[in-house]
């Protein structure tokens, strides 16, 4: 079973355990909202454009609310837990390594601080790759270069319209495990990372997806 499949299974189990009204790290969303999001994203792909295109946000938001009105929480979770439809399966790794991990942590950490999980080197490599990919999108408008620095993997430099200074003193360095860095670049603050740099530069960092 792949990493994203294991995360799907664990997230579904946790969502059924905590119920539809549990908090998540997704601002304003309960687990019911998250279940509807996961369902729409894979099973109503023609309505999911608002997750990536701002002009379609109202359409997707409406579809999400309609799914909650028409389907029970358990149905939405179980439909998603059964796996992606056939036309999406070839894209499962590309689409869901970060998605399933991030939302699993959104529920795990939604009600308070949770210790990060430990992963194999192979999984860490996947998560670091996802952090790089998501970070390129999230930090594209940031003027300040951000260097993600995991303990056992090469550092990754993101953002920074002005580039990294020769002395490297006008950068923000974020240190943490790959999974924590992935959560941080996607806007989560309930993470265990160390952020180093000039305070003004840190305040300039703009994480936006």
Give each language-model segment a name.
Residues 2-7, 26-30, 65-68, 92-95, ...:
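Short, contiguous, pocket-lining structural segments
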Residues 27-40, 56-57, 63-66, 136, ...:
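Short, charge-rich amphipathic segments
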Residues 30-31, 72, 177:
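Short, structural beta-strand-to-alpha-helix junction motif
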């Amino acid at each position: 079973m792949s990493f994203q499949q294991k995360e799907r299974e664990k997230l579904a189990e946790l969502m059924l355990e905590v119920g539809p009204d549990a908090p998540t790290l997704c601002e304003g969303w309960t687990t019911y909202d998250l279940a509807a999001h996961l369902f729409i994203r894979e099973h109503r792909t023609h309505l999911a454009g608002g997750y990536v295109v701002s002009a379609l946000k109202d359409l997707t938001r409406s579809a999400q609310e309609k799914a909650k009105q028409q389907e029970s929480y358990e149905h939405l979770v179980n439909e998603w837990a059964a796996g992606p439809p056939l036309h999406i399966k070839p894209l499962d790794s590309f689409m869901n390594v970060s998605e399933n991990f991030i939302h699993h942590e959104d529920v795990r950490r939604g009600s308070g601080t949770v210790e990060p999980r430990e992963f194999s080197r192979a999984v860490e490599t996947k998560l670091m790759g996802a952090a790089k990919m998501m970070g390129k999108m999230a930090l594209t408008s940031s003027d300040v270069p951000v260097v993600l620095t995991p303990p056992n993997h090469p550092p990754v430099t993101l953002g920074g319209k002005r580039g990294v200074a020769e002395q490297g003193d006008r950068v923000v360095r974020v240190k943490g495990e790959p999974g924590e860095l992935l959560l941080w670049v996607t806007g989560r603050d309930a993470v265990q990372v160390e952020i180093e740099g000039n305070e003004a530069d840190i305040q300039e960092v703009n994480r936006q997806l």
